[in-house]
Amino acid sequence: MATYPSAKFMECLQYAAFKHRQQRRKDPQETPYVNHVINVSTILSVEACITDEGVLMAALLHDVVEDTDASFEDVEKLFGPDVCGLVREVTDDKSLEKQERKRLQIENAAKSSCRAKLIKLADKLDNLRDLQVNTPTGWTQERRDQYFVWAKKVVDNLRGTNANLELKLDEIFRQRGLL
């Protein structure tokens, strides 16, 4: 029996596309940013076999508060407290310096809920896959290498969440000589 996305999921996808409409990835092709959030949700559904619609919707929205004018209140009003709670868990505090945010991602990864950990794993997997083939505009090779090292530290604190995603991440880390 085929399953179909719910109307709420499609509204969420449309909202994410609208909010990220002016944003581009830092790759040389300047890929529309919305592709990333779609990839994260797709990784969870297809590769991690996640059927929890709240997780899949929060994956679509995982950067919406951090990177657009959307607020947690907007997310809760439109998509409910469950999705909003997950978005809150995976959102960095942009008022902090970048290095502090990165440190907190490592530290807080282990304390996250299992559902938030899934989103973080899929987010890292998509970012690392992109980084394997594209050096972001303005990044040095050293900065790129440092991102892989940092991402491994985050992933190490997310372990035990989803074997499929962890195997795919480990494959990337192995290729980079980090395992």
Swiss-Prot record:
Entry keywords, A to Z: Hydrolase, Manganese, Metal-binding
Q: Which residues does UniProt mark as catalytic?
A: 66-67
* Enzyme Commission number(s) from the entry: 3.1.7.2
The annotated consequence of gene deletion is: Induces retarded body growth and impaired starvation resistance. Mutants have highly down-regulated DNA and protein synthesis-related genes and up-regulated stress-responsible genes.
CDD domains assigned: HDc
- Catalytic activity entry: guanosine 3',5'-bis(diphosphate) + H2O = GDP + diphosphate + H(+)
Positions of Mn(2+) binding: 36, 62-63, 123
One GO term of the biological process aspect: response to starvation
- Its Gene Ontology molecular function terms? guanosine-3',5'-bis(diphosphate) 3'-diphosphatase activity; metal ion binding
Cofactor(s) it depends on: Mn(2+)
Q: Domain HD: where?
A: 33-128
Q: In its keyword annotation, does this UniProt entry include Manganese?
A: yes
Return the SUPFAM superfamilies for the record. Answer: HD-domain/PDEase-like (SSF109604)
Give the family, as the similarity comment puts it: Belongs to the MESH1 family.
Describe the function of this protein: ppGpp hydrolyzing enzyme involved in starvation response.
Would you tell me the protein name for this molecule?
A: Guanosine-3',5'-bis(diphosphate) 3'-pyrophosphohydrolase MESH1
Please tell me the species this chain comes from.
Drosophila melanogaster
Tell me the lineage of the source organism: Eukaryota, Metazoa, Ecdysozoa, Arthropoda, Hexapoda
Q: State the gene name recorded for this protein.
A: Mesh1
